[in-house]
């Protein structure tokens, strides 16, 4: 079974699996708690984590480094 978006494509957007999971989990939690419908016009996934991963793949959700 193929998953969308693929992990390979997602790692082109966020270079670390740990960071990818953290960003997706935080966004999914926010969507759930705030009843946020998301920033994309439509989603393939019905679940919050899937929607967050789709937003990362679309470039709508990015990781900002606060390194100084």
Swiss-Prot record:
Keyword annotations from UniProtKB, A to Z: DNA-directed RNA polymerase, Nucleotidyltransferase, Transcription, Transferase
GO biological process, one term: DNA-templated transcription
InterPro entries per UniProt: DNA-dir_RNA_pol_omega, Pol_omega/Rpo6/RPB6, RPB6/omega-like_sf
GO molecular function: DNA binding; DNA-directed RNA polymerase activity
Keyword Thylakoid listed: no
GO cellular component term of the entry, any: DNA-directed RNA polymerase complex
Alphabetical list of SMART domains matching this protein: RNA_pol_Rpb6
Alphabetized SUPFAM superfamilies for the sequence: RPB6/omega subunit-like
Reaction catalysed by this enzyme: RNA(n) + a ribonucleoside 5'-triphosphate = RNA(n+1) + diphosphate
EC number: 2.7.7.6
Complex formation: The RNAP catalytic core consists of 2 alpha, 1 beta, 1 beta' and 1 omega subunit. When a sigma factor is associated with the core the holoenzyme is formed, which can initiate transcription.
Similarity field: Belongs to the RNA polymerase subunit omega family.
Its biological purpose: Promotes RNA polymerase assembly. Latches the N- and C-terminal regions of the beta' subunit thereby facilitating its interaction with the beta and alpha subunits.
HAMAP family found in the cross-reference section: RNApol_bact_RpoZ (MF_00366)
Annotated protein name in UniProt: DNA-directed RNA polymerase subunit omega
Organism expressing this protein natively: Listeria monocytogenes serotype 4b (strain CLIP80459)
Taxonomic lineage from the root: Bacteria, Bacillati, Bacillota, Bacilli, Bacillales
């Amino acid at each position: 079974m193929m998953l969308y978006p693929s992990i390979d494509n997602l790692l082109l957007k966020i270079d670390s699996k740990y960071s990818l999971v953290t960003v997706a989990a935080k966004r999914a939690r926010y969507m759930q708690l705030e009843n946020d419908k998301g920033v994309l016009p439509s989603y393939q996934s019905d679940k919050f984590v899937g929607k967050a991963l789709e937003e990362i793949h679309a470039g709508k959700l990015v990781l900002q480094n606060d390194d100084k």
